[in-house]
Amino acid sequence: MRGGSRHLSNEEDVSGCEDCIIISGTCSDQSSDPKTVPLTQVLEAVCTVENRGCRTSSQPSKRKASSLISYVQDLTGDGDEDRDGEVGGSSGSGTPVMPQLFCETRIPSKTPAPLSWQANTSASTPWLSPASPYPIIDLTDEDVIPQSISTPSVDWSQDSHQEGMDTTQVDAESRDGGNIEYQVSADKLLLSQSCILAAFYKLVPYRESIYRTLEKARVRAGKACPSSPGESLEDQLKPMLEWAHGGFKPTGIEGLKPNKKQPENKSRRRTTNDPAASESSPPKRLKTNSYGGKDRGEDEESREQMASDVTNNKGNLEDHCLSCGRKDPVSFHPLFEGGLCQSCRDRFLELFYMYDEDGYQSYCTVCCEGRELLLCSNTSCCRCFCVECLEVLVGAGTAEDVKLQEPWSCYMCLPQRCHGVLRRRKDWNMRLQDFFTTDPDLEEFEPPKLYPAIPAAKRRPIRVLSLFDGIATGYLVLKELGIKVEKYIASEVCAESIAVGTVKHEGQIKYVDDIRNITKEHIDEWGPFDLVIGGSPCNDLSCVNPVRKGLFEGTGRLFFEFYRLLNYSCPEEEDDRPFFWMFENVVAMEVGDKRDISRFLECNPVMIDAIKVSAAHRARYFWGNLPGMNRPVMASKNDKLELQDCLEFSRTAKLKKVQTITTKSNSIRQGKNQLFPVVMNGKDDVLWCTELERIFGFPEHYTDVSNMGRGARQKLLGRSWSVPVIRHLFAPLKDHFACE
């Protein structure tokens, strides 16, 4: 089914391709006479800023299939035609050579309904001619792992017309198995216009993408670049960049063409019209990633040897990295018997709690990579497993068997623990907690100062400074615990959040200026404080954001504002009064950012997932000196642990737990098929705002102020803390402060 076409926005232009590609083309001012424009060799690259889980607001790009990116050059000199079929102003033999980009990928659509309508309007969509004279230079790996027949890609040379040569066409398979086509002008996908040059100097994955692409071009061109063992990535890139900027001499463009003597890997270029593709399992059972798209040949050989040794009782799983097969791991695998090497462990810490928009993990549960992922069919499970892990660890042919099963229960749901050499740990839930809280690479800090419990007669009300207060979750929990609050100073810039706190707590909260404008004089005037809490925005820290700026740029820098005011609020050393603090942020952050935060706060975080005390997943890191922060999380009798407990009358839940609820409306839909979680009067329905509030632990209609709509209320809740988790952390404060 062919879909309609549309032009991508600027945001989509940046994320339209997963891999970096090289183009040797020419620069020209299209507004001037082409015959007077000098031909200048340039290096242009198209690359997402972050290879791991590229994601934008317009398309869930995590599921892009392994893209086939090509270089197309006009050698006819006849000029190109625009999207409307009209001949451009440049024609004749003097027409400069213009770069054309072709990218084929598989992207799930969020809106199946419009796709059906677009399918009826695509008859006039221009396509490339089968007899097109434009040579295609494929810069993808020849040894890439072939796609399965259920992950089709499109062969542009078989289904095209000559019109529209100046556009990049992306054929994307929608979630329901249909196809939708996008067209975008190639000059809008160039690095010089769509990417930030500073990213090359700041982001290692960006430089690695450039290096891998240049390395592929160098091998094809037979170019020898001098290198020595131990050279850094920057040192290896320098001569290759000079060669590329010089026009790929001496072979030039011809040297970038693939070797015709090598057989074509047809399984990697299977077309959507291939009858074998139509016989495969439903495409929405599969999920494809760009991360893990690197050559894993050596790792797979190592893992195959490991699996063979363990099967023949010649080796021990705990002596190998379960993800890559290397020996002498530095840590244990939290879910399955086996270890993890340093690089795989860091990847786990960053990506294990990263979820896609359908609620499933973004990467494989075993290796946190995966080119093609298989999703568990259990509605309460968010696990997925990659084809490579199933073939190596469970057994050859397992992946194909799994694709034919519907429903399929993953290896975390099946009662049987052992499947080949993939053996689930008996205590995996405790191991998972330890894995995220005991990092051997983190510094060992001195234990926080302990404050003895104060006799009831000497306790006084608590004084709180709340930074990035949100919707006053801290104040709400303190009141629910019965702790008397003498003053509650809150820094918040969101008008809707301030409205909720002001109305629901009847003016008991004093809202102050932006945190960046608060000085030591203000702290001295408002204080002293007994409790300082806060959680800076996670936009530039979360691995979900492909263009995140990290801890030291963008909103990530606001952490240092918390650190600054925390130091201002700390009592003098000779003052023995109890003083507590807590800082919260997302788990799916880079390991380096986590360690930097711990280094400044001089303590390691604890990881708490709200799934233990509520009906939704919400894993977060908490730093602080609150008493008993690392104690086990236990649900109380009043906690609503299942979705049904949170629903209104006559509404039935389809599942017991829901995935992480974010500020995006589609995060409410569950599972690989994006199902509605509730049934009412025989019809599927989304969660109502009051039900979302119960899931987070808030009272009914807590966010129902100032005529806010459903979307605005969900955004407030999506940025908030889980009330039962904060109650768990604040409960020991009852031994130090007066209670009602």
From Swiss-Prot:
Name of the protein in question: DNA (cytosine-5)-methyltransferase 3C
GO MF term list: DNA (cytosine-5-)-methyltransferase activity; DNA (cytosine-5-)-methyltransferase activity, acting on CpG substrates; DNA binding; zinc ion binding
Binding residues for S-adenosyl-L-methionine: I471, T473, E492, D514, I515, R719, W721
Zn-finger (GATA-type) residues: 320-350
Domain ADD: from-to ranges: 309-441
Tissue expression remark: Specifically expressed in testis.
Impact when changing C543 to I/N: Decreased DNA methyltransferase efficiency
Keywords from the UniProt entry: Differentiation, DNA-binding, Metal-binding, Methyltransferase, Nucleus, Repressor, S-adenosyl-L-methionine, Spermatogenesis, Transferase, Zinc, Zinc-finger
Quaternary structure, from the entry: Homodimer. Interacts with DNMT3L. Interacts with SPOCD1; recruiting Dnmt3C to transposons.
Effect recorded for C538A: Loss of methyltransferase activity
GO biological process, any: male meiosis I
Protein family according to the UniProt entry: Belongs to the class I-like SAM-binding methyltransferase superfamily. C5-methyltransferase family.
Segments of this protein annotated with the region Disordered: 75-99, 248-312
PANTHER family cross-referenced by the UniProt entry: DNA (CYTOSINE-5)-METHYLTRANSFERASE 3C, DNA CYTOSINE-5- -METHYLTRANSFERASE 3-RELATED
Primary location recorded for the protein, binned into one broad class: nucleus
Compartments reported by the entry: Nucleus
Gene null: resulting phenotype: Mice are viable and healthy but show male sterility due to defects in spermatogenesis. Male mice show hypogonadism and azoospermia with interruption of spermatogenesis at the pachytene stage of meiosis I. Retrotransposons are derepressed due to DNA demethylation.
Domain SAM-dependent MTase C5-type: start-end pairs: 462-740
Catalytic activity: a 2'-deoxycytidine in DNA + S-adenosyl-L-methionine = a 5-methyl-2'-deoxycytidine in DNA + S-adenosyl-L-homocysteine + H(+)
Major enzyme class: transferase
GO CC entries: nucleoplasm; nucleus
Entry's EC annotation: 2.1.1.37
Chain's role: DNA methyltransferase that specifically methylates the promoters of evolutionarily young retrotransposons in the male germline. De novo methylation and subsequent repression of transposable elements prevents their mobilization, which is essential for germline integrity. Compared to Dnmt3a and Dnmt3b, shows lower DNA methyltransferase efficiency.
Superkingdom of the organism of origin: Eukaryota
